[in-house]
Amino acid sequence: MQDAAPRLTFTLRDEERLMMKIGVFVPIGNNGWLISTHAPQYMPTFELNKAIVQKAEHYHFDFALSMIKLRGFGGKTEFWDHNLESFTLMAGLAAVTSRIQIYATAATLTLPPAIVARMAATIDSISGGRFGVNLVTGWQKPEYEQMGIWPGDDYFSRRYDYLTEYVQVLRDLWGTGKSDFKGDFFTMNDCRVSPQPSVPMKVICAGQSDAGMAFSAQYADFNFCFGKGVNTPTAFAPTAARMKQAAEQTGRDVGSYVLFMVIADETDDAARAKWEHYKAGADEEALSWLTEQSQKDTRSGTDTNVRQMADPTSAVNINMGTLVGSYASVARMLDEVASVPGAEGVLLTFDDFLSGIETFGERIQPLMQCRAHLPVLTQEVA
């Protein structure tokens, strides 16, 4: 395992930094984010995700996000072969929560923007203004070929042109209830959506390529990026700096939210033993599928999310940043994340979501300087 860099010493700079946002990346697909026969094996269900998000809300997580995946990687673990649908799942979760922000993901090749605008307005009503939309262009070709809607490999180089038109239609419909947008990909003729959302609808994206960041800088409220490495919590800093620079070009403030997996235990050694156990059970067949799919896009550059996902360094959890250690060590590393300019929040996954969120809320979060404004909670959510 790659060891961490020496512990950083830093000072949290201002009040905003003292309130780094925390979100949970809910397991909408089977087995969460560990591609391993040694990891917990489970199917995605509404009841599981309901328990996760209600527990996250209890411990003052700020938001919950679900991805969309339409075809998995196979292998012994049938990784992500079993998935719920994002908008319908998050509509259900909106109805059983009261404070936490809720985000669904739109696979934009599958859903016309006017339909997404209306679905989002509906969940805004269900949630009382707590809903937002994550827009993805689509990178895994077989997801769309199986339905006969893959637009051809030229799409790889035009996908953010497509998404730019898509979000303009959304903004028209949410803002005024009407769109007459005319573009290369979409033509609206007095298209109507009513009722409109009760609050401005947040749009988020996860672009790491230059084109993706340029899109986020112009249209997104914030941008997700991958953490990097194992116990190297600030290694993503160059990515956050690129996003900050791109946003400065548009005169907007678009922060970075960073994806990490937390594997924690009483001691560093106990947590590391779990991590090594998961790696030893890596599902090589599923990982080979991921590597093969990552090579299909030859037009978007070398800095895309999927290229990082397929990197062999930590492929067992698709190369999201990984924080492995005692509760105190993980708290310290998350405070180091908060020290990075442009980092406004983190999106967390866990090897075991229910116990992971509980130990985070009771043992890790109370030790974090960047969450010191929150009360310490020990009572389990019902």
UniProtKB/Swiss-Prot annotation:
Keywords: Flavoprotein, FMN, Monooxygenase, NADP, Oxidoreductase. Induction: Up-regulated by the nitrogen regulatory protein C (NtrC also called GlnG) and repressed by RutR. It comes from the Bacteria. It catalyses: uracil + FMNH2 + NADH + O2 = (Z)-3-ureidoacrylate + FMN + NAD(+) + H2O + H(+); thymine + FMNH2 + NADH + O2 = (Z)-2-methylureidoacrylate + FMN + NAD(+) + H2O + H(+). One of its GO terms (biological process) is alkanesulfonate catabolic process. This is Pyrimidine monooxygenase RutA. The gene is rutA. FMN binds at residues 68-69, 134, 143, 159-160, 209. Belongs to the NtaA/SnaA/DszA monooxygenase family. RutA subfamily. The FMN-N(5)-oxide reacts spontaneously with NADH to produce FMN. Requires the flavin reductase RutF to regenerate FMN in vivo. GO terms for molecular function: alkanesulfonate monooxygenase activity; uracil oxygenase activity. NCBIfam families: RutA (TIGR03612). Gene3D superfamilies: Luciferase-like domain (3.20.20.30). Pfam families: Bac_luciferase (PF00296).
